[in-house]
């Protein structure tokens, strides 16, 4: 799949590729016109794992009853790695985890910036976008369930 000629958040970021790998979606986002090649890439790896209420598995499949969506965001120019996970059970809202401030799942569709006043949070903001159609479909399924 890809390349995806989509402007990313209107900030000059464009999707470089989106391909399936062993049940995961890996997105390479390229920032065009960056002065330093080392600052021109933002890699987003999104793995969406969902089980519906009736037991029917939506791809990719995960064992267990929890709905799990994990994002690994690595920003090369800051050499900072943010691991953020959202988890939720049936009938409950899905929020960011790992000790970071809680955000509703809808926030995944827009930039996520951790408030600087939270001492547990990384110093710089981490932005994540669900770029792959499959992941977007899974998010929509969760929001409309």
Curated annotation (Swiss-Prot):
The lineage of its organism: Eukaryota, Metazoa, Chordata, Craniata, Vertebrata. It comes from the Eukaryota. This is Putative uncharacterized protein FLJ42569.
């Amino acid at each position: 799949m890809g390349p995806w000629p989509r402007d990313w958040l209107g900030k000059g970021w464009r999707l470089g590729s989106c391909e399936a790998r062993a049940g995961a979606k890996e997105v390479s986002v390229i920032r065009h016109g960056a002065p330093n090649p080392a600052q021109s890439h933002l890699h987003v790896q999104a793995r969406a794992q969902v089980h519906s209420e009736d037991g029917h598995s939506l791809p990719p499949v995960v064992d267990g009853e929890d709905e799990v969506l994990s994002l690994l965001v690595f920003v090369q120019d800051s050499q900072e790695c943010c691991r953020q996970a959202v988890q939720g059970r049936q009938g409950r809202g899905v929020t960011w985890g790992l000790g970071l401030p809680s955000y509703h799942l809808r926030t995944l569709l827009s930039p996520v910036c951790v408030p600087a006043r939270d001492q547990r949070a990384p110093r710089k903001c981490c932005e994540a976008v669900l770029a792959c159609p499959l992941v977007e479909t899974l998010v929509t399924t969760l929001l409309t369930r």
